[in-house]
């Protein structure tokens, strides 16, 4: 059984993407533009606020081993959208079990690096590590309303800068 430990929100406008993970311990926001080679990470831990700029996408030692469509006898729907199943296996031993819809088309669908080749919008995914630890994310709301560009603006004066790792 998977217990909810937080929420993750995703916003997309044009080539920009913003994801915010909120848990009782921290709030972490990740912002990137697919036309640039960097991303910004903001971490709020208690009263401490940190900002980090990183190369994005990163030079990764992990690569995709296999991508396999999974056919099922049942039809899965999330938020009213028919979903297809896909499994991604990675060289680090992790596995992503993905449910996506091809009924929606966004300019940025890879709000996770692993979604780059998924032919639609991911609405649910479970990451299983090589040590069999599982984390599941599932969309609970989808809003197709226009977004303000200010949503992607950061006031860097509010954060302590940390060096790129």
Please tell me what each predicted stretch does.
Residues 1-165:
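Extended soluble regions of mature proteins
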């Amino acid at each position: 059984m998977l217990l909810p430990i937080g929420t993750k929100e995703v916003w997309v406008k044009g080539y920009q993407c913003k994801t915010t993970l909120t848990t009782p311990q921290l709030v972490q926001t990740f912002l990137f533009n697919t036309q640039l080679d960097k991303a910004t990470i903001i971490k709020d831990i208690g009263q401490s606020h940190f900002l980090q700029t990183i190369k994005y996408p990163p030079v990764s030692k992990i690569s995709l081993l296999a991508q396999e469509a999974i056919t099922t006898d049942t039809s899965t729907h999330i938020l009213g959208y028919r979903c297809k199943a896909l499994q991604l296996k990675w060289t680090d031993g992790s596995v992503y079990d993905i449910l996506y819809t091809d009924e929606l088309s966004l300019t940025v669908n890879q709000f996770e690096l692993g979604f780059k080749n998924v032919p639609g919008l991911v609405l649910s995914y479970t990451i299983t590590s090589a040590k069999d630890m599982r984390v599941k994310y599932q969309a609970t709301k989808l809003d197709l309303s226009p977004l303000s560009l200010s949503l992607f603006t950061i006031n860097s004066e509010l954060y302590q800068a940390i060096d790129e790792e």
